[in-house]
Structures are given as structure tokens and as C-alpha cells.
Amino acid sequence: MAARKGRSRTCETGEPMEAETCDPGTEGPSQVYLPGRGPPLSEGEELVMDEEAYVLYHRAQTGAPCLSFDIVRDHLGDNRTELPLSLYLCAGTQAESAQSNRLMMLRMHNLHGTRPSPSEGSDDDEEDEDEEDEEEQKPQLELAMVPHYGGINRVRVSWLGEEPVAGVWSEKGQVEVFALRRLLQVVDDPQALAIFLRDEQARIKPIFSFAGHMGEGFALDWSPRVPGRLLTGDCQKNVHLWTPTEGGSWNVDQRPFVGHTRSVEDLQWSPTEDTVFASCSADASIRIWDIRAAPGKACMLTTATAHDGDVNVISWSRREPFLLSGGDDGALKVWDLRQFKSGSPVATFKQHMAPVTSVEWHPQDSGVFAASGADNQITQWDLAVERDPESGETETDPGLAALPQQLLFVHQGETDLKELHWHPQCPGVLISTALSGFTVFRTISV
């Protein structure tokens, strides 16, 4: 296996179970546990998280689960690797009743690594110091919430100059834009947060709302090149373009982009061209569009059968002309946009045993991406990893030999995974949301 220097190929599980049942007298040769591929766990067996496989690992819950979230870029600097970490998220809940939902700003801080500082000796003074250190290293969470009627399907954050905003798709069939500056301010100040929660949160309203879609939707993306330009797609197959206007408002083109025949599942603006975007749909297709053309004629390229079933998610690489897709068929596919007319992906990976729910390219490493699935797996991949046939290397475990060479890491331990994002300012840090809550982690592989 030829791998990049310093990169481990890991198939450890991150299942955070409490204990492992093991009979030393019957212990046989160790094997790597492969979810969905090997024999099921025996009665009394449990998976144990291998903390040595993680540089960072933290979990958080917010009450009602969140179907979607986005990372809010901050002013703490780029390429942050020094621990403890701080980060900001904007998320929306899926509560049991429509009136119980919230749009939330989360500040997670004091996030230490998994490797504790070594301590020697066991006298009382050192034990007291260890207890104090443990208390000081507890992760912290501040939460500012505003009421939102209706479950939130998707949240995407953008900066309009110095103003952070969130685009919010909800089950009530509206897309709203919320200003986030006040929420960001109060999660940094406990006293201001208390005043906000007591006196202000109920008064926070969207700065703009669009009810022109014919129903609810999930697809939403801010342009990375034109501040304020927005795309929204619904379950009725329509995509609308939002153009910012003076005074902090938007002009939404009532003419939808025509092409898909079923629900539009995801949208991605090109990172290099102002007017080009990609879409994927439950009609199994991926389409490339150019907004300079009339909406009825804007579809320039189509792969009609990109997956065997719904195409759920796409991610457009910021560094290479690649589009990544994940579908109900559990497949991950990499498309070279220079060869998109061929209708064939340049790579296909079938590790997930259930629909893929989220995909995203690493913001700094051009060949690395992550995916989550309804099989409760998060997988990390590197296109640059391949076996060197001249090296003579072979996998000692037959289960590992059957794995894709590019698979770096399999993380487990979540329930009903919905979305993941790499932190753009903290290399290698992944955040996911699931029914079981939020997880922030970094593996030894990326």
C-alpha cells in the first residue's frame, strides 16, 4: 500500500461504547471489525472506541435533533491546529411539534484532544491536581436560540461583507434569511446571552422571506464568488435564483430552472465560475447549468442516470474540476467535469450499505473527502492512495484486502446521520449531526 507520508490507513471504529466483553482464555487472533461486511457481533460483545485513532473527539446535544447545520467562519484565524479548539455552528432543529423548533447559534470551545497529559505518581496532591486539570479540560457549549415555526430542513451560512447571514429552508415551504450578528455576539458573552434569552430572542425575525416555491425543499447554496447570490430548490423539481439588491433584500426570479422531473435534492455553485451551478435530483440525474441563459434553456450538461435511484447530495471541489455525488444506492461517485459529457464517473466507491446522506471535499487537501450514510458510518477517503504493485505489499487481514484502497477511516457511534462538514479553518476537523447529536472529531488519518 503506497500512501502519503504520515498518513495512516485506518479502519478502526469510533463506537463510544462503555466496555468490551472479552474472555482471555478464548482469545484468538485479532481481526479488524468491518461494519456490514463481517460476521455480526456475538452476544455480550461490544465495540470499544479506540482513542488512539482520534486526535480530537467530542459530542454535544441540543435537545431536539438537527437535520442540518453549517459552520460559521470566524475571526480566530486559519489553519488552527493548536488545542483546545473553538468553533461556531448555526443549526436548525426538527422538533416533535412545529412551534417547538429553533434556529440556533452554537459556540463550542475548550475542545481538548483525546490524549491526556501524562501524570506520574499517585499521592494526594497529584490526584487533586489531576481532578483540577480534568475540570479545566471539560468542553464548553454556549447556545443562542430563536423561535422558528416549522422544522428546519437545511441551513447554509454566508458572509455579506461583514454581516453573517443564514439561509433557512423549512418544512412550511418558505426560504428565509436570518441575520446572525447578534447571535454571534451573545454566545461570546455569558451576561449578554442571559439578557438575550430573557428579552430578545422572541423578537428575532427573518430579514427576508420567499414563499414562491410550491412546497418544501432541501436544496440551498450561497455563491462562493458573488456575495448574496443564492439558489434554492424544492421537492416539486423547481430551482429559483436569488439576486441581492440594495438595502439588504433579494430579487427572486419567479421563473424556475426547468430540467429535473422529480425533487431537487442538492445544489452546488461552481467555485471558479460566477454563473455556473450543479444540481442533483431524485430523478437520478446530475445537471450543470449556466444562469446567463434563460431558465428554460439554462441546462448545459446532463448525466441522466448518475446513480441507481435518487441522487441525494453533491459537492464541488474547490481545488480540482471534480464533482462528488452520493445516492440512495449507497454509492459514492467522482465526476471529472472535463469529461462530464461521457456520462461515466472517474471513480465509484461502494462502502456504504444504505443511502448516502452527506458528502464534502476537504477544503485544503484536493484528493480527500468525507461521506456519511444512513448505515451510521462516516467514511474518509483519499483519491491519491493506491497500492504499489511493485512493492509486494499485501494485506494480512483478508477483510482489509477487500476494502477500497482509497478508504482511510470508518467512524461509527452515531444514530441516523444526516450531515457533515469539514471545518474550513481547522484542518482535518469534521463535524456531523445525527439523531444522537453533534460530533466534533479529527482522526489520525487526515
UniProtKB/Swiss-Prot annotation:
Ranges for the WD repeats: 212-252, 259-299, 306-345, 351-391, 412-445
Compositional bias per record (Acidic residues), positions renumbered to this chain: 121-136
GO cellular component, one term: cytosol
PTM-bearing positions, type Phosphoserine: S119, S122, S344
Region of interest called Disordered, as start-end residue ranges on this chain: 1-29, 111-141
Gene Ontology biological process terms, A to Z: DNA replication; nucleosome assembly; nucleosome disassembly
Gene3D superfamilies xrefs: YVTN repeat-like/Quinoprotein amine dehydrogenase
UniProt modified residues of type Phosphothreonine: T10
Function (record text): Histone binding-protein that regulates chromatin dynamics and minichromosome maintenance (MCM) loading at replication origins, possibly by promoting chromatin openness.
PANTHER family from the UniProt entry: GLUTAMATE-RICH WD REPEAT-CONTAINING PROTEIN 1 (PTHR45903:SF1)
Protein name per its UniProtKB record: Glutamate-rich WD repeat-containing protein 1
Organism of this sequence: Mus musculus (Mouse)
